[in-house]
């Protein structure tokens, strides 16, 4: 069954394995989440648990938010997300979910909002090749052909310059190197989406058949 927790990306560092290998890791600070609601097939058409992360003052919350959190005997939350595929029988409303639901060696998927890059060209945004850099070249970094003459228009799928980043991105099959329940930290091998202090969702990997090497 799926396990999941909400946290914030602290940044990257490196640790040494027992055999001396240097491992680059991303540190995620996941303070205890609170189960705000259990979604059931009878009431909602699907099964999921709703987690809340980071308290906010009641002054900054509206009445529906305050009432929803009160059912779980907790304060209103800044971030609320659902974890589908979880065994809802293992959870109760108001229960805390901590980093110790994971263990070293677990394979997870991490979802976050990618860093915003602003307005970028087709080469940086889509990875296109540039044109010839010779003096007589007609273009260097332009998008290139807009398409054939016959349609008499540019198709929506044409890769063009525009805003880059700020999108929901999931990196799959990352390995948890270390779990620190005392400090509510997860150390995950490799990089995860988003800037420092960005919200991330750590869930059991969907496609992992075996533990990553």
Curated annotation (Swiss-Prot):
Key words, A-Z: Ribonucleoprotein, Ribosomal protein, RNA-binding, rRNA-binding
This protein's record includes keyword rRNA-binding: yes
Region (Disordered): 122-147
GO molecular function terms listed in the Swiss-Prot or TrEMBL record: rRNA binding; structural constituent of ribosome
GO biological process assignments: translation
A GO CC annotation given for this chain: cytosolic large ribosomal subunit
Keyword RNA-binding in annotation: yes
PROSITE patterns, per the entry: RIBOSOMAL_L3
Residue ranges crossing the lipid bilayer per the database entry: none
InterPro entries: Ribosomal_uL3, Ribosomal_uL3_bac/org-type, Ribosomal_uL3_CS, Transl_B-barrel_sf
Domain of life according to the entry: Bacteria
Oligomer and partners: Part of the 50S ribosomal subunit. Forms a cluster with proteins L14 and L19.
Function: One of the primary rRNA binding proteins, it binds directly near the 3'-end of the 23S rRNA, where it nucleates assembly of the 50S subunit.
HAMAP family (UniProt xref): Ribosomal_uL3_B (MF_01325_B)
Assigned protein family: Belongs to the universal ribosomal protein uL3 family.
Protein name per UniProt: Large ribosomal subunit protein uL3
Organism: Geobacillus stearothermophilus (Bacillus stearothermophilus)
């Amino acid at each position: 069954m799926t396990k999941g927790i909400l946290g914030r990306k602290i940044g990257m560092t490196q640790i040494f394995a027992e055999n001396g290998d240097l491992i680059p890791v991303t540190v995620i600070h996941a303070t205890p989440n609170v189960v705000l609601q259990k979604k059931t097939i009878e009431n909602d058409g699907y099964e999921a648990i709703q987690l809340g992360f980071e308290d906010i003052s009641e002054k900054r919350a509206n009445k529906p938010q305050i009432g929803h959190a009160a059912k779980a005997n907790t304060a209103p939350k800044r971030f609320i997300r659902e974890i589908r595929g979880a065994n809802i029988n293992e959870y109760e409303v108001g229960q805390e979910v901590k980093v110790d639901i994971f263990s070293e060696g677990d394979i997870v998927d991490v979802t976050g909002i990618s860093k915003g890059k602003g307005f970028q060209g087709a080469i940086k945004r889509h990875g296109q090749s540039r044109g010839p850099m010779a003096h007589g070249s007609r273009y260097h970094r332009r998008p290139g052909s807009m398409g054939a003459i016959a349609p008499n228009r540019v198709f929506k799928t044409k890769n063009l310059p525009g805003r880059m980043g700020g999108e929901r991105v999931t990196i799959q099959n990352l390995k948890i190197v270390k779990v620190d329940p005392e400090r509510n930290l997860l150390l995950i091998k490799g990089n995860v989406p988003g800037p420092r202090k960005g919200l991330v969702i750590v869930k059991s990997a969907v496609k992992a058949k075996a533990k990553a090497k």
